């Protein structure tokens, strides 16, 4: 096949990407209406639909290419020509970076993730100089207090596109003004510039106003989550200006935002200033471009191994019965490979484990489940693998290994953010932090349950602690929907000797769970038991879990807050009605 056919193939792939991103924007643009109508089930469906759009369109393009030329894929020289032609289509293309990832996905689908080399794939971007190009149209508007902060805030909020009444706009303006005046020097605040993104960021049951405050030579986040009340009005729930708070809002354990972004690279660069700790991959994922986020994720790994001389090692912590986990001492991610054989007590299959990871990808993670990136045929230099890890790989996952001489290929693995295992964290911290993390752990369980997720194995080793001190679940092999579980009370013993028997005196079905038992394997330490009884004793009662199930079955969708409850304006003690005169003071 000649150069004309290469043009045809390249154009077909790019047109397929155009179709995919057009549908992506179409689903995203419906976020405002779903929010205004408080159609939370439609929000969940749209989230799952948008995630699956990408693979669907990759499949459509692959079928087209097979029709164009059934032999396509067996001539490696020809594939390199197609990539050259495709690269030539990108210099003036507004979403070139994601178009490159789409090309990669089509290639991987055609060639079953084989021969992943830079001449056939965009391992690195073809146009690095354009990554930080000028934005063709402003992504935000500038607002100035001009000695009247409240008036400026009123203008910002009244300019929002939402077609819903405010519950009490003057109260909310007072709360925001008061918070800002307590956070920043008042004189500097009145001379600040507020840059407000043109588009709202939608997720779960909230619409987020995202902005920046330029003050005193510094730039701070300015985030306002907007929620519904029960009467159809809207209100501002809090104001966040701290980098750590903003990082949690855009965190890796949360669902992707719905934000209209025809130029995602421009939005990523705009966000970077208020999320300096976030990598490029995390920013793309946060705005819903998760497949390109995966491309950047891999590039960040390549950058790490290029500049680091560390070897990959077995990850610290208790070894898993289902997963072999490894990392590098200073790398912020871990690699997880499904073992060829599981421990006898694990009644799951490899297929079931992969289904669990897909469920987490598509479900609302409520800030409590780590996002993962799935890779096939992952190649690593043998020299970068420690002897202990190599031995473990050959022992636990030999069926997933392929020897390539000085390299080794792992047929399937996951990569996710590295955290401190909760059980290790609890052994190392002082009393105050121990109490805090027990509170966090219980909150994580409750928030997952409210989102219709039952973790299955609730042992501390299956949870991690982030750099912000949040507890996140990361072991998914026993995960299931809350509505699939039968929560039972333990029946009273028939005879005194029943309690001494090695086997239960009552029947147990596969989906039966007895919350009373949680106390025995979670509270072996008296300090932990005391904190659990103080803050989360309801987790040990079957009635609590059954009540949650009823709420889920009735269609109730819980609110999810990406910040501490004490930060909510509704927790303030001031009187809620204020005159405009006081607001403006």
From Swiss-Prot:
One MF annotation (Gene Ontology) recorded for this entry: AMP binding
Catalytic activity: L-seryl-[isocitrate dehydrogenase] + ATP = O-phospho-L-seryl-[isocitrate dehydrogenase] + ADP + H(+)
Active site: 371
Gene Ontology process terms (BP): glucose metabolic process; glyoxylate cycle; tricarboxylic acid cycle
KW Nucleotide-binding (keyword) present: yes
InterPro entries associated with the record: AceK_kinase, AceK_regulatory, Isocitrate_DH_AceK
Residues holding ATP: 315-321, 336
Family membership: Belongs to the AceK family.
Entries under HAMAP family matching the protein: AceK
Matches recorded under NCBIfam families: PRK02946.1
Name used for this protein in its record: Isocitrate dehydrogenase kinase/phosphatase
Organism: Photorhabdus laumondii subsp. laumondii (strain DSM 15139 / CIP 105565 / TT01)
């Amino acid at each position: 096949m000649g150069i004309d056919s290469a043009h045809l193939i390249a154009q077909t792939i790019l047109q397929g990407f155009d179709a995919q991103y057009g549908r992506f924007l179409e689903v995203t643009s419906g976020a405002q209406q779903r929010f205004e109508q408080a159609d939370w089930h439609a929000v969940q469906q749209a989230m799952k639909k948008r995630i699956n759009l990408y693979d669907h369109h990759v499949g459509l393009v692959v079928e087209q290419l097979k029709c164009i030329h059934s032999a396509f894929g067996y001539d490696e020289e020809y594939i390199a020509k197609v990539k050259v032609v495709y690269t030539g289509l990108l210099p003036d293309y507004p979403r070139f970076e994601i178009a490159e990832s789409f090309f990669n996905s089509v290639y991987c689908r055609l060639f079953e993730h084989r021969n992943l080399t830079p001449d056939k794939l965009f391992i690195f971007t073809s146009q690095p100089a354009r990554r930080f190009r000028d934005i063709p149209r402003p992504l935000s508007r500038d607002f100035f207090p001009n000695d009247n902060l409240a008036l400026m805030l009123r203008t910002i909020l009244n300019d929002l596109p939402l077609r819903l009444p405010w519950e009490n706009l003057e109260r909310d303006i007072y709360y925001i003004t008061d918070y800002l005046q307590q956070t920043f020097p008042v004189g500097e605040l009145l001379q600040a510039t507020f840059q407000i993104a043109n588009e709202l960021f939608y997720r779960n049951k909230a619409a987020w106003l995202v902005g920046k405050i330029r003050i005193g030579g510094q730039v701070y986040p300015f985030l306002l989550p907007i929620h519904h009340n029960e009467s159809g009005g809207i209100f501002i729930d809090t104001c966040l200006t701290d980098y750590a708070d903003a990082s949690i809002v855009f965190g890796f354990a949360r669902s992707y935002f719905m934000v209209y972004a025809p130029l995602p690279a421009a939005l990523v660069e705009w966000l970077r200033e208020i999320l300096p700790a976030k990598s490029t991959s995390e920013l793309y994922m946060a705005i819903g471009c998760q497949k390109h986020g995966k491309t950047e994720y891999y590039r960040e790994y390549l950058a790490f191994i290029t500049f680091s001389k560390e070897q990959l090692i077995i990850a610290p912590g208790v070894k898993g019965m289902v997963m072999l986990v490894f990392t590098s001492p200073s790398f912020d991610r871990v690699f997880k490979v499904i073992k060829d054989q599981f421990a006898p007590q694990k009644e799951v299959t490899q297929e079931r484990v992969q289904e669990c990871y897909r469920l987490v990808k598509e479900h609302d993670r409520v800030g409590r489940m780590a996002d993962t990136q799935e890779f096939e045929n992952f190649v690593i230099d043998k020299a970068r693998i420690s002897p202990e890890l190599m031995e473990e790989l050959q022992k636990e996952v030999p069926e997933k290994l392929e020897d390539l001489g000085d390299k080794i290929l792992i047929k399937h693995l996951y990569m996710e953010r590295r955290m401190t295992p909760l059980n290790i964290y609890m052994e190392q911290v002082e009393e105050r932090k121990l109490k805090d993390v027990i509170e966090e752990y219980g909150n994580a369980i409750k928030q997952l349950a409210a989102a219709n997720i039952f973790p299955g194995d609730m042992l501390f080793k299956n949870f991690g602690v982030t750099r912000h001190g949040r507890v996140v679940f990361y072991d998914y092999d026993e995960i299931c929907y809350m509505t699939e579980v039968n929560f039972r009370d333990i029946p009273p013993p028939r005879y005194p000797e029943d309690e001494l028997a090695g086997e239960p005196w009552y029947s147990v079905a596969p989906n039966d769970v007895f919350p009373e038992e949680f106390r025995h394997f979670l509270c072996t330490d008296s300090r932990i038991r005391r904190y659990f009884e103080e803050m989360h004793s309801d987790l040990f009662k079957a009635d609590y879990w059954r009540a949650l199930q009823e709420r889920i079955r009735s269609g109730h969708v819980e609110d999810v807050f990406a910040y501490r409850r004490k930060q909510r304006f509704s927790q303030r003690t001031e009187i809620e009605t204020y005159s405009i005169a006081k607001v403006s003071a």
